[in-house]
Amino acid sequence: MKLHFFNARILSMEEGMEITMGEVWTEGTRILYAGPSATKQEICRKLQREDLEFNREIDCDGDLLMPGFKNAHTHSGMTALRSYADDLPLNEWLNEQIFPVEAKMTPEDIYELSRLAILEYLTSGVTAVFDMYLTPESIARSFEDMGMRCVQVSALNNFSQSLELMEE
């Protein structure tokens, strides 16, 4: 899919992070061009291409176009449990409410709940996550099926005792 975003305020991650008016050209998952507006011929010349036909052209109407956010701490399969008994202290919430519910969840439940989480991430501008949760195979499959980037991280904690009693 070849996309042409134009009439956009572009925030690059270059030093100074200035916002400039311009356009972005993409092909598949690659950004071909991000910069000031110019004629198609001028940009094709910069890209060393004869021509480029777009599948879709999107007028951003002056809206901000920027790189996607990365969420470095997610539990995708538990997104739907976020507000479940959320008025309790953390350890009580986890031990008495969340862990018993999670014990009943199947890998397929976690797969479907992860897909729901991915939709939430995308509506928030998140394009990649670091996820740590049960049944990593289900999580990986959901991200692969939805076409989103995910790094699986193993747990580095032990909730079986209080923080005061844990050894470093």
Which sequence ranges carry the predicted segments?
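Active-site-proximal flexible loops/turns
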Residues: 14, 68, 78-82, 132, ...
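N-terminal metal-binding scaffold of metallo-dependent hydrolase/deaminase domains
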Residues: 1-46
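Residues that scaffold the ATP/ADP-binding catalytic core of kinase and kinase-like folds
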Residues: 13, 34, 79-80, 93
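Conserved beta-strand termini and adjacent loop/short-helix elements that scaffold enzyme active sites
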Residues: 34, 60-61, 153
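Divalent metal-coordination and catalytic microenvironments
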Residues: 8, 24, 29, 62, ...
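Divalent metal-dependent hydrolysis catalytic cores, especially in the metallo-beta-lactamase
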Residues: 114-162
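Active-site gating loops and adjacent loop-to-helix segments of metal-dependent hydrolytic enzymes
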Residues: 80-112, 146, 151-168
